[in-house]
Structures are given as structure tokens and as C-alpha cells.
Amino acid sequence: MSEIIVGGKYKVLKDRYYSETDEWILVKENIAIVGITDYAQKKLRDIVGVELPEIDKEVKANDPVAVVESVKAAADIYSPLSGKVIETNQKLTESPELINKDPYGEGWIFKLEISDRNEIEKLLSPEKYSELIKQREGL
């Protein structure tokens, strides 16, 4: 899988979109799989809990829908697109550390049925998200 390594330590995969609030979005037809980025999980450090969104919940882009708790802080997870939550990653209730171990794979948080595909254009490309990390980190 093609990736960008930012600052020698933050992995950004090239097959998905990103949000300014550090969510990644993998679009498959009208479904979006959402998780938090490698950058976000490294900033949070050891993740110890996850509050998952409700199934069938209708959400708008930028609505807070989930919470990830680490030993350091709790962080809201925002829906990057409008739609309906159709699935959540139940493995995270027992093993929240999957977000640290595999943020772009087994650590996914929820799946969304997209209601407005035009919103995808507002998301960041891997290159733009990489630039955002560089700005934040002074790289």
C-alpha cells in the first residue's frame, strides 16, 4: 500500500481521504469507513477506551459521534461526512488498543452510509493532510 511518511514517523496512506480533525475516510461506493489517523493515535498515546456511535444514527458532517479515551486525554471523533451510521467496530470495546496497533486497519471505528457525496470534495487529500501535520509539527 502506498504511503507518505511525514517527519519520519507519521504514516499517511494514499488510498483514502482525511479530515482536519484527524479522521481518515476510506470510500467504497456509498459507504465510508472511518477511523483516526496514525498522527492522532500517536498524539493520544495509549488508548484505553472507545465510546462508539449508535447504529442507525443520522449524522451531519463535523458532528461529534464517538470518543476515544487515552491515559492522556479524551478526544471527540467527528463524522467527516453526512449520513447514517451502519456499523461500528465492536472489537474496540474489548481491545481499544487496536487503534494504536493498526489505526488504518483493525482500528477502524465506524462505517457510514454517505448521504451527500459532494461533501467528499471538502475532505483533504493525503498530500494536503501531510502538509497539515508538517505545519502543526513545525516540519
From Swiss-Prot:
Function in brief: The glycine cleavage system catalyzes the degradation of glycine. The H protein shuttles the methylamine group of glycine from the P protein to the T protein.
NCBIfam families linked: gcvH, PRK01202.1
Organism lineage string: Archaea, Thermoproteota, Thermoprotei, Sulfolobales, Sulfolobaceae
Assembly with partners or alone: The glycine cleavage system is composed of four proteins: P, T, L and H.
Keyword Translocase included in the entry's annotation: no
Organism the protein comes from: Sulfurisphaera tokodaii (strain DSM 16993 / JCM 10545 / NBRC 100140 / 7) (Sulfolobus tokodaii)
Protein name per its UniProtKB record: Probable glycine cleavage system H protein 1
Transmembrane portions of the chain: none
Residue runs in coiled coils: none
Modified residues (N6-lipoyllysine): 72
Domain of life: Archaea
Biological processes annotated in GO: glycine decarboxylation via glycine cleavage system
Family from the record: Belongs to the GcvH family.
Cofactor binding note of this UniProt entry: Binds 1 lipoyl cofactor covalently.
Originating gene: gcvH1
Gene Ontology annotations for the cellular component aspect, listed alphabetically: cytoplasm; glycine cleavage complex
Keywords, sorted A to Z: Lipoyl
Residue span(s) of domain Lipoyl-binding: 31-113
UniProt cofactor(s): (R)-lipoate
InterPro entries: 2-oxoA_DH_lipoyl-BS, Biotin_lipoyl, GCV_H, GCV_H/Fam206, GCV_H_sub, Single_hybrid_motif
